[in-house]
Swiss-Prot record:
This protein's name: tRNA dimethylallyltransferase
NCBIfam families: miaA
InterPro entries found in the cross-reference section: Dimethylallyltransferase, IPT, P-loop_NTPase
GO molecular function: ATP binding; tRNA dimethylallyltransferase activity
Organism this protein belongs to: Thermosipho africanus (strain TCF52B)
Described purpose of this protein according to its UniProt entry: Catalyzes the transfer of a dimethylallyl group onto the adenine at position 37 in tRNAs that read codons beginning with uridine, leading to the formation of N6-(dimethylallyl)adenosine (i(6)A).
Sequence similarity: Belongs to the IPP transferase family.
Protein keywords: ATP-binding, Magnesium, Nucleotide-binding, Transferase, tRNA processing
Enzyme class: transferase
This enzyme's EC code(s): 2.5.1.75
Reactions that this protein is recorded to catalyse: adenosine(37) in tRNA + dimethylallyl diphosphate = N(6)-dimethylallyladenosine(37) in tRNA + diphosphate
Family matches, as PANTHER family: TRNA DIMETHYLALLYLTRANSFERASE (PTHR11088:SF60)
Positions bound to substrate: T10, A11, V12, G13, K14, T15
Length: 301
């Protein structure tokens, strides 16, 4: 069987529709979302409600705490274990979410062709200790494409990218793009007309504020430092600036909406890279028809 990945831009309406389908076909949901993976970050990541999660079992939501390290490689390891467990139990695994790097980790895997060089890794690590930021500068120089994908604080992946470059003379970003897409997966992208999608984004942000996003951020800052990677994401970074009196709440809300719209555009651009993906525009068909088409896509052999 082929495994189904259902994706689409934020606020397109994936959760609502997939929940209904999953309950009809004995499916569980494996979240493909790099923010919903965090515990305590509920409102700002638009997690499914307790009621929604009670209807269908979800995995990789509330998986780690905000100060724990996690990346696409770890996601792949966890997701494949869960996938195989569900298949053995006769349950359909549905991968649902819009984090591009996580989707890539499933359909393309990771380049692992260069053996580890512990001596080189130690030397690079020492360089970073003596001159913080030097590895980032080197990566931007030798492999700018990889630098765009790797977070500045992700020293492990930075060292790996530099290790590959120094051992082979080739950029890890080029070697990764040469890998073929797995035939084990099929991708379905849900979309909407832009004006409708952006209106849904705006309404969802307003809903987050009403549900207590500001208090959620305050509570998080009582437990964790503000500079965690998890807090440098849309919805959290803007509210943190508001709490620091950098700007007022109206400005923070405006920026969350604006930044979310920009993020949705980037997601759409990323998803267009998957030439084999099927697209369904939810603005053009009824909910009933959409559910029929999605269910048919999932169950196709």
């Amino acid at each position: 069987m082929k495994y189904t990945i259902i994706s689409g831009p934020t606020a397109v309406g994936k959760t609502d529709i997939v929940l209904e389908i999953a309950s009809q076909i004995n499916a569980n949901i494996i979240s493909v979302d790099s923010r919903q993976i965090y515990k305590l970050m509920d409102i700002g990541t638009a997690k499914p409600s307790k009621e929604e999660k009670s209807k269908v079992t979800h995995y990789l939501i509330d998986h780690i705490y905000p100060d724990e390290y996690y990346n696409a490689f770890l996601f792949r390891q966890d997701a494949l274990k869960i996938r195989d467990k569900l298949v053995n139990e006769g349950i359909v695994p549905l991968f649902v979410g819009g984090t591009g790097l996580y989707i890539d980790s499933l359909v393309r895997g990771f380049f692992e062709g260069v053996p580890k060089d512990e001596k080189l890794r130690k030397e690079l690590s020492e360089m970073e200790k003596n001159e913080p930021g030097i590895l980032r500068s080197m990566l931007e120089k030798y492999d700018p494409q990889a630098a765009q994908k790797i977070h500045p604080s992700d020293i492990k992946r930075t060292i790996r990218a530099l290790e590959v470059y120094f051992k082979t003379g080739k950029k890890i970003s080029q070697l990764q793009t040469q890998s073929e897409y797995s035939k084990d997966y099929k991708i379905l992208v849900l979309d909407r007309y832009r004006d409708e999608l952006y209106e849904r984004i705006n309404l969802r942000v307003d809903k987050m504020i009403k549900e207590g996003l500001v208090d959620e951020v305050k509570s998080l800052l009582e437990k964790y430092p503000k500079d965690l990677n998890a807090f440098q994401t849309i919805g959290y970074k803007e509210i943190i600036r508001y709490l620091e009196n950098t700007y007022d709440l109206n400005t923070a809300v405006h920026l969350i909406k604006k930044n979310t719209r920009h993020y949705a555009r980037r997601q759409i651009i990323w998803l267009r890279r998957y030439k084999q993906a099927k697209w369904i525009n939810l603005s053009e068909i009824s909910r009933k028809k959409a559910i029929e088409e999605i269910k048919k896509f999932i169950l196709e052999v």
